[in-house]
Amino acid sequence: MRVVFAGTPEVAIPVLDAVAASSHELVAVVTRPDAPAGRGRRLLASPVALRAEELGVPVLKPAHPKDPEFQEQLRALRPDCCPVVAYGALLPQAALDIPVHGWVNLHFSALPAWRGAAPVQHAIWAGDEVTGATTFRIVKELDAGPTYGVMTERIRPTDTAGDLLARLAEGGAGLMVATLDGIEDGSLEARPQQAEGVSYAPKVEVEDARVDWSRPAVVIDHQVRACTPAPGAWTTVAGERLKLGPVTHADAHGSQGLGPGELGVGKHDVLVGTGTTAVRLGDVRPHGRKQMAAADWARGARLQTGVRIGVAFGES
């Protein structure tokens, strides 16, 4: 089939590479426009755009897929199907109607669970043991189109959102190619999603990532891993923001009776009390500084056991 791939961030590259290496003819790539990045706010091309250029594939960067000029360009390419991974813009019906077999999205959950922008983060945050990736035909309703295929992936106890997303992208690459193959030879038909089990995964905002130390340790662990690497879990210390890397559980004996948000500062580690048992901080990043081990941070800041941080969204 003639295919036009749509995607923008790094996570889409494994699928782009798999499609490019498949028997299908990759005639173009669609991605978001160059965007300012870094301290100098220089315009940079998306990771997908850069990879497409390495592959020698033409790149389209419409300001919005509703633009008539873009739709004419797409129509001229005569695509049979448009595989999509994290493109980052809503597709109007006029664009959806152009490819013969529509637009096929790879979504990083086992639909109908976790429809929306942040399925991996929400699966970890909810404490799910298993998640997956699904290929489905895009329709107007959010992530509600009929599905072609699904893969499952166990969520490991130490998985961050970044870890899990990387595995799903690698596994999903094979799923996407198999889906395109099945569409081409007629062996695969899209099936409506189940009406039961629908859940939603809206974007996780920075404020959502603030840790409430009065919550149980297991909930805080899930939250921190779900928000790693982005937007990054955080708390406050003396009014300054402190970003948190993944935490580990301290046993009940090691909790030292610490109250929520109360520090237990040792020579080699730093504990924080929660609504249940304490957690042990891993790496942290103070405001305006580089990431460091929690013990080094506490030593440099001259923090002692009993200091309270970010308690119930306000310090005391």
Swiss-Prot record:
Binding site for (6S)-5,6,7,8-tetrahydrofolate: 109-112
Annotated SUPFAM superfamilies: FMT C-terminal domain-like (SSF50486), Formyltransferase (SSF53328)
GO molecular function: methionyl-tRNA formyltransferase activity
Record carries keyword Protein biosynthesis: yes
InterPro entries reported for this sequence: Fmt, Formyl_trans_C, Formyl_transf_N, Formyl_transf_N_sf, Formyl_transferase-like_C_sf, Met-tRNA-FMT_C, Met-tRNA-FMT_N
Matching Pfam families: Formyl_trans_C (PF02911), Formyl_trans_N (PF00551)
EC identifiers of the protein: 2.1.2.9
Catalytic activity: L-methionyl-tRNA(fMet) + (6R)-10-formyltetrahydrofolate = N-formyl-L-methionyl-tRNA(fMet) + (6S)-5,6,7,8-tetrahydrofolate + H(+)
Superkingdom in the source lineage: Bacteria
Record keyword Transferase present: yes
Keywords: Protein biosynthesis, Transferase
Enzyme class: transferase
One cellular component term from this protein's GO annotations in UniProt: cytosol
Protein role: Attaches a formyl group to the free amino group of methionyl-tRNA(fMet). The formyl group appears to play a dual role in the initiator identity of N-formylmethionyl-tRNA by promoting its recognition by IF2 and preventing the misappropriation of this tRNA by the elongation apparatus.
Family: Belongs to the Fmt family.
The protein's name in its UniProt record: Methionyl-tRNA formyltransferase
Organism in which the protein naturally occurs: Nocardioides sp. (strain ATCC BAA-499 / JS614)
Gene this protein is translated from: fmt
